[in-house]
Amino acid sequence: RVCMGKSAGFKGLCMRDQNCAQVCLQEGWGGGNCDGVMRQCKCIRQCW
C-alpha cells in the first residue's frame, strides 16, 4: 500500500518532480511528485 501526503516544506508551485522528490526525501518520505491542477508537491512512501 502507498501513502501520500502534502509536503510540509515545499514552497510555491511544483513544476519539477525531481525538486519535489528531494524535499520529500529530506522530510523522511520515500519520494514525491507534482500533482493536481494546483501543482502541489505530494510525498509518497510505503505504508502497511
From Swiss-Prot:
Keywords, comma-separated and alphabetical: Antimicrobial, Disulfide bond, Fungicide, Plant defense
Intrachain S-S bonds: 3-47, 14-34, 20-41, 24-43
Superkingdom: Eukaryota
SMART domains given in the database record: Knot1
Coiled coil start-end: none
PROSITE patterns per the UniProt record, alphabetical: GAMMA_THIONIN
Pfam family, one: Gamma-thionin
Gene3D superfamilies: Knottin, scorpion toxin-like
Gene Ontology terms: biological process: defense response to fungus; killing of cells of another organism
Family statement drawn from the similarity comment of this UniProt entry: Belongs to the DEFL family. Protease inhibitor I18 (RTI/MTI-2) subfamily.
The protein, known as: Defensin-like protein 2
Origin species: Sorghum bicolor (Sorghum)
Taxonomy of the source species: Eukaryota, Viridiplantae, Streptophyta, Embryophyta, Tracheophyta
